[in-house]
Amino acid sequence: GDINTTTANISCSVMIFYFDVGGEYNISVGYADASDAFTQNITHNFTLASTSAIQVSPNNLTYDSDVNPGSKNITSNNDPITVNNTGNVQVTSGNVRITAQNLIGETTKTQYIPALNFSVDVLNSTYGGGPPYGECLDGIDSQNSTNFTNGTAQGINNSILAVGKHSLQNGTSGQEHIFVCLKSVPLGISIQSYSTLELGEWVIDIA
């Protein structure tokens, strides 16, 4: 509002989104009054930091109870795992990583499902254009699926996290969907729950 005949106090605001690219920004303000007298100030700058961050859901990956020893190429019943880019830095291909652990039997702890029996992909097994073949290798040496290694971070092939508005929920704008396959259940293990309780959670991160 007007302070006097020659001075006015003007307030404004500018929205900054979490996906705006980091760097130096200039603040430019100009004002023209009713008599076309004009003034401006372009001397102020600010720096928006670059932030690498993700949010992952769901927190639990589950399989149907009818999975038995010898079963092959089983897909999760609550996929995909959604990885949201909540920062403003693009994650390039293969730099979304997963660290898996062997799944230990909750009753008989000497029995386990090896982490290497799982594979992951950014396409699911219902993809009809194959190759690529989705998260299950199905006996095919697919270069697109990524096999897990116990306790070691593995970059997921073709996984890209663009910078964008992930709330669009379209699987591409600031978002990646990944699908996990249990390629085979070892013969000779008993029917029981196998989980991460003993060796720790699986971790999805970015490099």
Go through the PLM ranges and name each one.
Residues G1-I42:
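Long, low-complexity serine/threonine/glycine- and acidic-rich segments characteristic of extracellular
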